Amino acid sequence: MIHMLSSFDLKPGEDWKVLVCDYDNFLTNLRAVDMIIDAGPLGHRVEDTPMDTDKARTQSCFSLMRFRDRAQLDAAYAYIQANTQPSTATHLRMYRRLTNAVFLCWEDTNLGKDTT
């Protein structure tokens, strides 16, 4: 499984509730066309804890999406870049509300695990 962490800030004057609504619609559309396995809700950073040690990045908002494999990840990227579907229009509306966006992907490993 591949995971994608999106970290970002909302531009000044943008409405969090509108972003959440668009994000939920975006996920519904991506699930309907099998472009993601699952995704978590949008969230806010909890930086006033010793567990948050990242001083290099200041983003305050996050989301996490999960993809079956590299093929699904790449297909989702191509789908969004095509800008031809309702979900891609929603993605563009969301992206225009963001600033300081950074995306990080990683893949699960099965080292030391029996996969039979």
Where are each of the predicted segments found?
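Beta-propeller fold detector
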Residues: 40-42
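Active-site-flanking beta-strand signature of metal-NTP-handling nucleotidyl enzymes
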Residues: 2-9, 62
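Carbohydrate-binding/catalytic loop surfaces
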Residues: 44-52
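Long, low-complexity, Ser/Thr/Gly/Pro-rich intrinsically disordered segments that act as flexible linkers
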Residues: 104-115
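Short, surface-exposed ligand-recognition loops at beta-strand->loop->(often short) alpha-helix junctions
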Residues: 11-19
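A general structural signal for well-ordered alpha-helical packing
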Residues: 3, 20-23
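An amphipathic, aromatic/His-enriched active-site/gating alpha helix that lines ligand/cofactor pockets
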Residues: 24-38, 52-60, 64-105
